[in-house]
Amino acid sequence: MQNHVISLASAAERRAHIAATFSRHDIPFQFFDALMPSEELNRVMAELVPGLAKQHLLSEVEKACFMSHAVLWKQALDEGLPYVAVFEDDVLLGKDAEKFLAEDTWLEERFDKDSAFIVRLETMFAKVIVRPDKVLNYENRSFPLLESEHWGTAGYIISREAMRFFLERFAVLPAEWIKAVDWMMFTYFFDKEGMPVYQVNPALCTQELHYAKFLSKNSMLGSDLEKDREQERRHRRSLKVMFDLKRALGKFGREKKKRMERQRQAELEKAYGRRVISFK
C-alpha cells in the first residue's frame, strides 16, 4: 500500500507527529507537499479544475486543500498506481492500523482494483447512515456502504478509476458546481454515478482536532483549515446558498434527481438509522 500524507513542507510539528505515528505502527509513508495560495496553485487549478478559481464561496486555503488532493491523484495516475491511501497531517491511527496500511492483500481480496471505489478510513464522530454490504470483515472492522454525508478527507483509500472519474469531471465542472473537496467525495451533492464509498467501522483513523473535541479535550495540533471550514459551514447553512444550490441543480436538470436521492436517503435512515462511527 502506498501511503501519502498531505502536509506543508514547513509544518515541522505536524510532520514530526506523522513520523512518530506511522513509525509506531511500522507503516511506510511518503509526504506530499501540500499546496498553498500561490502562482503554482493558480497554474494547477487552470490545468485540472479551472472552475475552482471562480468559486468565490471557497477560501484560497480551501482551494489549496482541494488541489492538494487533486494533484496527488494526478500523480498517482501518472505513476500507474491501482489505488493509493491518502492522509492529512493531523491524523491519528487506530489499533492494528499496520494490518491495513503496511499491506494490501486484504484490499485486493475484497475489492476489484480495476473498479471505481473509495474506502473511507476516517470518522468525524457525526451521525451517519451506513448500510450493510457483503464485503467480508477484516481484523474486527466492517465495510458498510456510506449512504449519507460524512465530512473530512483525513484518511481514505481511492482506486485508480475513482481518481480518474473525479479528475475527468472536475475538469469540466462550472464554478457553481464545485464545493469543498470533502463535499465532492462524501455527499450526494455531486453525482458519483453509483460509485460506492465504503466506511470502515470502527474507523481506522480520525483527525486529532475532532477526536479532542469528541473527548472534550484541547487539541494539541489544531487545524490550519478550521476557520476556513467553519466559514464554509456557515455558507452551507445559509438560505442564500441553498437557493443558489437549487438554482444550479435546476439549471442542469438535476433537481428531480436530487429530490429522489434525498427521499432514498430518508428511507435508508428509517431502515438503518443514523450512528456515530467509532474510532479505535
Language-model-derived ranges and their functions:
Residues 1-87, 91-280:
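An acidic/histidine-cluster motif and surrounding catalytic segment
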